[in-house]
Regions:
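Short Asp/Glu-rich motifs
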Residues: 1, 85-86, 138-139
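Short, solvent-exposed turn/loop segments enriched in Gly/Ser/Thr/Pro and often Arg
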Residues: 1, 78-81, 132
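N-terminal binding-site loop/beta-alpha segment at the start of enzyme catalytic domains
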Residues: 1-15
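Glycine/proline-rich, positively charged
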Residues: 9, 23-110, 114, 120-127, ...
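Extended hydrophobic secondary-structure segments that form protein cores and membrane-embedded regions
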Residues: 17-20
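Structured C-terminal cap/extension of enzyme domains
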Residues: 94-99, 114-212
Length: 212
């Protein structure tokens, strides 16, 4: 669908296309990535990621080849559990990565210990998944009013509150909240507009969520 839409609208040059490979074996990896390129109708993918570190060394070897050939612009790895951070960190230290995608939220802050500082040190861009803690943050905030002081940094909803806390971290490049509702998508996008909370305000936000 994305490939059809970008082709029909002629907007490929305005998009950053990112996808992933999630299989074992070199040939299977190549088939998976070529299928993604076909579906996206793209001669070049901006970012290809080894998802959940599956056969990571094999797939990274292919990604390095593809990057040299110009078939992808950037390469990276992903995981969605803090339990994998030790392995993620090892790869960040041993491989030349452009991106790392990890879970990080007001309820899952383990990435602050080593992953985020290391990403800044090595110049690795960070994509945040599970920015709402798998929905647990909304469960905490349900029926709770958004604090008046959230307006100081342009927040009009809890979703924007949670997202702005994340993207205000200087180590974070972007967050990717999942949704299948257009009005939620529009609301989430607004978190990237306007002012962001500073360090003191982020601490205040974290303390509030901890008290919910």
């Amino acid at each position: 669908m994305i490939g059809e839409l970008t082709a029909a609208l002629g907007i490929r040059d305005k998009l950053f296309l990112a996808t992933k490979v999630w299989t074992r074996g070199k040939e299977n990896g190549i088939k998976s990535m070529e299928r993604s390129m076909t579906l996206l109708r793209a001669k070049q993918i901006d970012l290809m990621q080894v998802h959940n570190l599956v056969d990571v060394q094999t797939q990274l070897a292919t990604l390095r080849e593809w990057k040299a050939q110009g078939r992808i612009r950037y390469l990276g790895i992903t995981h969605y559990e803090a339990g994998a951070f030790a392995d993620v960190e090892k790869i960040m230290r041993s491989e030349k990565l452009d991106f790392v995608q990890i879970n990080y939220s007001l309820m899952e802050r383990e990435a602050e210990a080593s992953i985020l500082p290391l990403a800044q040190e090595r110049g690795i861009a960070v994509i945040v998944n599970r920015p709402f803690g798998g929905g647990d943050l909304f469960s905490r905030a349900r029926s709770k009013p958004l604090p008046d002081w959230a307006a100081e940094f342009g927040c009009r909803s809890w979703a924007q509150f949670f997202l702005k806390w994340i993207v205000a971290n200087s180590a974070v490049t972007c967050a990717i909240p999942a949704t299948n509702k257009p009005h939620h998508l529009e609301e989430n996008l607004q978190a990237g507009a306007g002012p962001l909370p500073d360090g003191k305000m982020r601490q205040r936000m974290a303390e509030l969520v901890s008290s919910l």
